[in-house]
């Protein structure tokens, strides 16, 4: 719609490492707290879209060719044939995923819904990610002028952090799964030099 009427699409609020650390400081060892920590770390480290995050299963956790922790992305918006891709993750996230697996004592989807009684449901719906991020942001009691976080906040924030660290555009594109320079640059457009 924005393209049709000549307006730029609004940029998602970046969930940068700094904001990630603030949000993580509010995650406790409760069922919800641990699930939220998994969501935050998995979203930031993998730079995946909401639907892709919700599709990860425990069986997708693996070791990369270099023997380091990784997770397999089986299908994505830019991989419609399901060729798959191995995404590196930190040892910290790998250990957290194992802790989460033991806590919910189940296989299947990693990100799960949790009802008000603390019962673990099936896989989390992609729309729930934005709702959870907004709630986590509200719990921080950050400035009300701050735009709410959304599902794309992981991708924007992590891409901006990589750029700040001096990573070349090609490497950022590989991490984020962008196939064209223009797509990646669109996520980096609010970068201030």
Predicted regions and their residues:
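Flexible interdomain linker/hinge and immediately adjacent N-terminus
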Residues: 1-25, 75, 114-120
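Residue-level marker of regulatory loop/turn positions in helix-turn-helix DNA-binding domains and
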Residues: 12, 31-32, 42, 125, ...
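Basic, Lys/Arg- and aromatic-enriched nucleic-acid-binding interface segment
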Residues: 17-50
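Short, leucine-enriched amphipathic alpha-helices that occur as contiguous helical runs
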Residues: 20, 35-37, 126, 130, ...
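Mobile genetic element proteins and their domesticated derivatives, centered on retroelements
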Residues: 23, 39, 47, 73, ...
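Short, charged phosphate-coordinating catalytic segments
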Residues: 43-67, 170-174
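Basic, alpha-helical nucleic-acid-contacting "clamp/cap" segments
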Residues: 64-120, 131-140
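Short, basic (Lys/Arg/His-rich) helix/loop patches that form interaction surfaces
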Residues: 106, 130-174, 181, 193
């Amino acid at each position: 719609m924005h393209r049709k009427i000549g307006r730029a699409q609004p940029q998602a609020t970046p969930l940068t490492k700094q904001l990630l650390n603030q949000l993580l400081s509010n995650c406790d060892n409760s069922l919800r707290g641990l699930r939220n920590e998994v969501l935050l770390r998995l979203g930031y480290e993998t730079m995946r879209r909401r639907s892709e995050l919700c599709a990860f299963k425990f069986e997708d956790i693996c070791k990369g060719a270099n023997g380091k922790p990784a997770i397999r992305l089986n299908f994505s918006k830019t991989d419609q044939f399901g060729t798959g891709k191995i995404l590196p993750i930190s040892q910290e996230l790998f250990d957290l995923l194992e802790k989460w697996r033991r806590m919910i004592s189940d296989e299947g989807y990693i990100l799960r819904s949790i009802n008000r009684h603390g019962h673990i449901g099936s896989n989390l719906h992609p729309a729930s990610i934005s709702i959870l991020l907004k709630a986590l942001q509200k719990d921080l009691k950050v400035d009300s002028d701050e735009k709410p976080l959304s599902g794309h906040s992981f991708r924007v924030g992590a891409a901006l952090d990589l750029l700040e660290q001096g990573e070349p555009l090609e490497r950022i594109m590989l991490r984020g799964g962008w196939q064209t320079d223009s797509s990646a640059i669109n996520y980096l457009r609010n970068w201030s030099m």
